[in-house]
């Protein structure tokens, strides 16, 4: 399971070190794509195959399904870790996530999220206030 939080800095070429714990789980190759809430999602190749299968089941006749599939797949790239443990985050994905320098990696069970440090701090502040309320809404899921 992917979990934990790590901070790294992106270099001038758009490369960033993937935390060793996450590299162990993800493997040497994985998929990086646009995520929700202005972050990036990182999936192992096996998990990505599961997601592709689920996306194939979405009805082509539904506008929201088409839009989500386009959003999710259009920005997706396969990444390979270099000898220094880094990946290159393409400019279109850096722009989507507002990544300029400092990034936060977060393990979220089956995926890693990559956030701009500034965006993550804003998001964290906004959810800290409502964390208890969110937990109450999740009561039906026996968490």
From Swiss-Prot:
Keyword Transcription among record annotations: yes
CDD domains: MraZ_C, MraZ_N
Record-level Gene Ontology MF annotations: DNA-binding transcription factor activity; transcription cis-regulatory region binding
Domain SpoVT-AbrB: 5-47, 76-119
Localization per Swiss-Prot or TrEMBL: Cytoplasm, Nucleoid
Record key words, sorted: Cytoplasm, DNA-binding, Repeat, Transcription, Transcription regulation
Entries under InterPro entries matching the protein: MraZ (IPR003444), MraZ_C (IPR035644), MraZ_dom (IPR020603), MraZ_N (IPR035642), MraZ_sf (IPR038619), SpoVT-AbrB_dom (IPR007159), SpoVT-AbrB_sf (IPR037914)
One term under GO cellular component: cytoplasm
Entry-linked Gene3D superfamilies: Transcriptional regulator MraZ domain (3.40.1550.20)
Classification via Pfam families: MraZ
Domain of life from the UniProt record: Bacteria
Record-linked HAMAP family: MraZ (MF_01008)
Quaternary structure and interacting proteins, as annotated: Forms oligomers.
Full protein name: Transcriptional regulator MraZ
